[in-house]
Amino acid sequence: MALPRPTSPHARGSNRTPAIMRLVLGACVPGLLTLTWLYGPGTLLNLAWASLVALACEAAMLALRKRPPGVFLKDGSALVTALLLAVALPPYAPWWLTLVATFFALVFGKHLYGGLGQNPFNPAMLGYVVALVSFPLEMTRWPSPDSALGLPDSLREFLGLATRPDAWAHATALDVLKTDRSLTVDELFAGNPAFGHLGSAGSEWVNLAFLLGGLFLLWRRLFTWHAPLGMLAGLFAMSLLFWNGSGSDSHGSPLFHLFSGATMLGAFFIVTDPVSGATSNRGRLVFGLGVGVLTYVIRAWGGYPDGVAFAVLLMNLAAPTIDYYTRPRTYGHRKAERGFKAGD
C-alpha cells in the first residue's frame, strides 16, 4: 500500500515587494505634502513627470532584457525611485533635468546591474548626483518658502518658459554657512531669511515630516533601527565635535545639521535600502555611521553644501567590505568565519 508523502507547508510572509513599496510611498506623503505646502506644486509636477519617465525606462529596459514588463512594472520600485528623486530635486527643476536624473537612476543605477535586487548603488542617489555634477546651477535654484508659485507659474517654470530674476532663488542655510564667514551663527539665524528655528528655513519642517514617515516605517518593521540611528549618531557626533559655539568659523550646531538638507530623508529612506547597504545589524550600524560622518565632512569642508547623496554612494562602495568584517556568527560556531577555505 502506497503511503501519501505530502510536503510540509511553506511559511508565507506578507512582506512582498509591492506591499513594501506601497508602504514606502505612503510614508513619503508627509514630506511630499510639506514640500508642496512650502514651495508650491512644483514638487508634484516633478513627481508626475519622474513617474512617467521611470515607468517608460523600466518598460524599455525590461523589453531589452526580455523580461515580462507586466510583472515587474507592478512591483512599485520604479515609482519609489521616482518619488525619492522628486522630493530631492529643486521644486522648480526644468523637465529635462528630472528626465536626466530619472533616466540615469533607472537605466544606469538599476538595470545595468541586473535590475531590482542587484544594484550596488542606490539608484535615486546615483541619478541625483549625475544631475548635481552635470547641472550645478539648476540643482541649486531653491526658492524661499515665502515665494512659492501657483500652478500656472509652476508649469511655466517646469517647461522652461519663464525667466525668473536671480533674487527669486536664494541660498539655503547650508550654502550660507559654508560661504559666509563674516558673521557668527547667531547673527546668521537672526538676520538671514535662509535660517529657521532649528535649521534651514522650510527644510526643518520637511525633515520633521520625513522623520514622521520614517518612524512609521520603523514601527511597521520594514527595517531595523541600526542604519538610521547610525547615520544620525555619526552626523550628530561630528557636528558636536567640531562645533565651537556660534563663532564665525563654526560649521553649525548638531541640531542644525539634523534638521537641514536631506538628513531625515537620507536616514530613513536612503540608507535603509536593503540592496545597496550592509546586510547584518552590526554592518548596518557601521554603514549608517559612515554615511553620517561623510555627510558632515562634505558639508563642512567639501565642495557641495549637502553631502548625503555622495556619502551614500561612497558607503555603497564600502558595503561589501563592511559585510565581510561584520558577518554574524553561524549557529553552532563560536565566531563568524570569514573568507574561503582551501578546496571550497
Curated annotation (Swiss-Prot):
Q: Where in the cell is it found?
A: Cell inner membrane
A GO biological-process term: transmembrane transport
Q: Which InterPro entries match?
A: NqrB/RnfD, RnfD_bac
| Highest taxon of the lineage | Bacteria
Q: EC number(s)? A: 7.-.-.-
Task: List the record's Gene Ontology CC terms alphabetically.
Answer: plasma membrane
How does the record say this protein sits in the membrane? Multi-pass membrane protein
Q: Please list the residues that carry the modification FMN phosphoryl threonine.
A: T172
Predominant localisation class? membrane
Q: Which cofactors, by name?
A: FMN
Q: What class of enzyme is it?
A: translocase
Q: Where is the signal peptide?
A: none
Q: Where are the transmembrane segments?
A: 23-43, 44-64, 77-99, 120-140, 198-218, 222-242, 252-272, 285-305, 306-326
Got any disulfides in this one, which pairs?
Answer: none
Question: What UniProt keywords apply to this chain's record, in alphabetical order?
Answer: Cell inner membrane, Cell membrane, Electron transport, Flavoprotein, FMN, Membrane, Phosphoprotein, Translocase, Transmembrane, Transmembrane helix, Transport
Q: How does it assemble?
A: The complex is composed of six subunits: RnfA, RnfB, RnfC, RnfD, RnfE and RnfG.
What does the protein in this record do? Part of a membrane-bound complex that couples electron transfer with translocation of ions across the membrane.
Q: Which family does it belong to?
A: Belongs to the NqrB/RnfD family.
Q: Please give the name of this protein.
A: Ion-translocating oxidoreductase complex subunit D
